[in-house]
UniProtKB/Swiss-Prot annotation:
Pfam families: Ank, Ank_2, SOCS_box. Pathway: Protein modification; protein ubiquitination. This is Ankyrin repeat and SOCS box protein 5. May be a substrate-recognition component of a SCF-like ECS (Elongin-Cullin-SOCS-box protein) E3 ubiquitin-protein ligase complex which mediates the ubiquitination and subsequent proteasomal degradation of target proteins. May play a role in the initiation of arteriogenesis. The SOCS box domain mediates the interaction with the Elongin BC complex, an adapter module in different E3 ubiquitin-protein ligase complexes. Residues 278-329 form the SOCS box domain. The keyword Electron transport does not apply. PANTHER family: ANKYRIN REPEAT AND SOCS BOX PROTEIN 5, SOWAH (DROSOPHILA) HOMOLOG.
């Protein structure tokens, strides 16, 4: 009994220590959560300077480092295309890779504004061509979003990745959806996968069909995009059938789109077309009319050659007329 009585105070002290540690941990967690909520409130209200002050004071993040910094004069000069001011700021020692609270760099701003000279100056000063914002946006994405082929080419020359993982916003899909076929041309020339499938978007061809961007659809198909790959079980023809463009539907059919393909609802493209529309009539007519032997042969030969070797078609010992036919020229 005496041993138990002596050990009891120690057990109580030990439990008190654990309780104190737990209390301190909970208090610290509460303070951090409160500060995070407060910072978010200031950000939403547009007071990023106050958010930066909180971060610097409580998290030990220096505002000079730029991680939580507001837009710098360099950001402003880049976004407005003021080249002379940009060069002056760089000569004064401003960080070329300074980021805002959203991790936007001056290069992001220059590309978003299609300011090629500013973008070149930043890249020559050491700007990161693959900088990523908190939303996963790169300078190349901004360039393709604005249709700036010059900025896109410049970024790629300075090491920008033409294609990132599927979890990041895709410059290819952005260019295809907005009809910026010149940017798409450049990306294709730099070796992108024209069939890159992003789960919530589908392939670039599917996106282009949804947005009715004929020139981008043509560029993708000419580059060898798979006419059957869309979004999940929906093919590009499913997407085009829901739109009014007969030109796009005819183009897809010419490149071998399967008129009998079914999506997850077991619906064919013709089932999705507006009743009594021109698109529905074309699909029904194509369904009832067999493809010509020339068309079937062209599709068969192209499939056999493969997308990676389309550029070798001119080397085949064939008449120029047949070469052009195989290349849809």
């Amino acid at each position: 009994m005496s041993v138990l009585e002596e050990s009891r105070p120690f057990a109580q002290q030990l439990s008190n220590v654990y309780f104190t540690i737990l209390s301190l941990f909970c208090f610290k967690l509460f303070v951090k959560i409160s500060l995070a909520i407060l910072s978010h409130f200031y950000i939403v209200k547009g007071n990023r300077k106050e958010a930066a002050r909180i971060a610097a004071e409580f998290y030990g993040v220096s505002q000079g480092q730029g991680s939580w910094a507001d837009r710098s004069p360099l950001h402003e000069a880049a976004s407005q295309g003021r080249l002379l001011a940009l060069r002056t700021l760089l000569s004064q020692g401003y960080n070329v890779n300074a980021v805002t609270i959203d991790h936007v760099t001056p290069l992001h701003e220059a590309c978003l504004g299609d300011h090629v000279a500013c973008a070149r100056t930043l890249l020559e000063a050491g700007a990161n061509a693959n900088a990523i914002t908190i939303d996963g946006v790169t300078p190349l994405f901004n360039a393709c979003s604005q249709g700036s082929a010059s900025c896109a080419e410049l970024l790629l020359e300075y090491g920008a990745k033409a294609q990132l993982e599927s979890c990041f916003p895709s410059p290819t899909h952005e260019a295809a959806s907005k009809g910026h076929h010149e940017c798409l041309d450049i990306l294709i020339a730099w070796g992108i996968d024209v069939d890159q499938d992003i789960p919530h978007l589908g392939t670039p061809l599917y996106v282009a069909c949804m947005s009715q961007q004929f020139h981008c659809i043509w560029k993708l198909l000419y580059a060898g995009a798979d006419v059957h790959k869309g979004k999940y079980w929906d093919t590009p023809l499913h997407a085009a059938a829901q739109q009014p463009s007969t030109e796009i539907v005819n183009l897809l059919l010419e490149f071998g789109a399967d008129i009998n393909a079914k999506n997850t609802d077991l619906l064919r493209p013709v089932d999705l077309a507006t009743s009594n529309s021109a698109v529905e009539r074309i699909l029904l007519q194509h369904e009832a009319t067999p493809s010509s032997l020339c068309q079937l042969c062209r599709l068969c030969i192209r499939n056999y050659i493969g997308r990676q070797r389309f550029h070798l078609i001119p080397q085949l010992q064939l008449p120029t007329l047949l070469q052009n036919f195989l290349q849809y020229r």
